[in-house]
Amino acid sequence: MPKQKTHRASAKRFKRTGNGGLKRSNAYTSHRFHGKTKKQRRQLRKASMVSASDMKRIKQMLSQMK
């Protein structure tokens, strides 16, 4: 049986945290900032956590990642 591989695109987008969560960066941060408030832009710089409903799918894609 072939080896199970890590989904490389997902591995570049998510980082594991110390207590088993997954950290991700926010969308809407590359252009069109004139329609966003200063507060929105500041909050989008911070990383977010992956929601519990998506966690199972993403952990499966990253199963071989340490």
UniProtKB/Swiss-Prot annotation:
GO molecular function: structural constituent of ribosome
Annotated Gene Ontology cellular component terms: cytosolic large ribosomal subunit
Source organism, top-level taxon: Bacteria
Residue ranges of coiled coil: none
Gene Ontology biological process: translation
Biased composition (Basic residues): 1-16, 31-45
Keyword Secreted: no
PROSITE patterns, per the entry: RIBOSOMAL_L35 (PS00936)
InterPro entries: Ribosomal_bL35 (IPR001706), Ribosomal_bL35-like (IPR021137), Ribosomal_bL35_CS (IPR018265), Ribosomal_bL35_sf (IPR037229)
Record Gene3D superfamilies: 4.10.410.60
Region feature (Disordered): 1-52
Keywords: Ribonucleoprotein, Ribosomal protein
Family recorded in the similarity comment: Belongs to the bacterial ribosomal protein bL35 family.
Protein name as catalogued: Large ribosomal subunit protein bL35
Gene: rpmI
